[in-house]
Amino acid sequence: MHRLLQTQPKNFLTTFANLYNSMNKINYQKELDRVIEKITGVGKVPKLLLHVCCAPCSSYCLEYLSKYFDITVYFYNPNISIADEYNYRLSEEKRLVSLMPFEHPVKVIEGEYLPKDYFEYVKGLENEPEGGKRCEKCFRLRLESSARYAKEHGFDYFTTTLTISPLKNAQLLNSIGAELAEKYGIPWLYSDFKKREGYKRSIILSKEYDLYRQNYCGCVFSKRDSVTAEN
């Protein structure tokens, strides 16, 4: 089989690889369901470190997960290099948490804000398209910080709100999370929050709480691409 594939043109191999990956995608919502079923009714509420990118994306995730976890929001986003934008998104997250009703405690902590770390980490990838290699590195930077913090502070799980976006690759995010879970010895909570209309629910909650909804992901490169697309 492998020898046969090696004789095919490159475009055939690419098509085959894409087809194979699409047929073997993991349903991460079902993985999350299994964890929730396991922890429900055991008498102890597990501690979850939830990496949050912005208030709108976190709205549904918090509504959903706070039924089962004691959550600490980890706002670590050095990719947002414009300080005013960063501070506004952080203040909106804090405001949302102060307003939403939760079954279990939710608090917000801020990770170290050093945009230079982000620029050094993605150096050479400045002209990559949105969703490409630069974004993959950005995911890894933020999730690695989350994994390290979760391990050092005794959390039971860590995860991110990033999978709620239709523009973010949940397969990639969960793959990175699982890799870091093994590296740091802290369980990764699988997710695909856009499932079960989670993204639509986040839009409803954003309107309900009058949340600031930015039109770009966060870095200056995504802002550049957003402006280009609008023109």
Regions found by a protein language model. Give the residues of each.
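Low-complexity, intrinsically disordered or signal/transmembrane-proximal segments
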Residues: 2, 6-8, 20
